[in-house]
Amino acid sequence: MLMRTDPFREFDRITRELTAPGTWSRPTAMPMDACREGDTYVVSFDLPGVDPEAIEIDIERNMLTVKAERGPAGNAEHVRMEVAERPLGVFSRQLVLADTLDTEQVRADYDAGVLTLRIPIAERAKRRRVKVGQGESHRQITG
């Protein structure tokens, strides 16, 4: 049996999936940056227009999950949108954290639409010098 594929229909389907608002079962990814500042990793997520109360941050084992939801502005009953280009819905991002990070000391700040997480490196993973001692017996190696 010969199947025909309409590339325009397929393109429309992909466009709808990419531009559709996120849902809790299928959230949209949020942009992020990550860098290291000394002994701390800094991860920033763009979440403009999101109420800080609508942001959830969970760490389970080594999986960090950030979820946020942005709804329509104002009271939806009395608002008639003329232009709606800003994405609405649920946004989510998951990161696998290394065992060398201290997940008990994660700090989160939300300012000017940017969520910033600071994740310190665990003390046990920081660089340290090991002093070399001299043994009790001194033997000369001959060969």
Swiss-Prot record:
Disulfide bonds: none annotated. InterPro entries: A-crystallin/Hsp20_dom, HSP20-like_chaperone, Small_HSP. Coiled coil: none annotated. Residues 23-135 form the sHSP domain. It comes from the Bacteria. Induction: By heat shock. SUPFAM superfamilies: HSP20-like chaperones (SSF49764). The keyword Zinc-finger does not apply. Keywords: Stress response. Belongs to the small heat shock protein (HSP20) family. This is 18 kDa heat shock protein. It comes from Streptomyces albus G. The lineage of its organism: Bacteria, Bacillati, Actinomycetota, Actinomycetes, Kitasatosporales. The gene is hsp18.
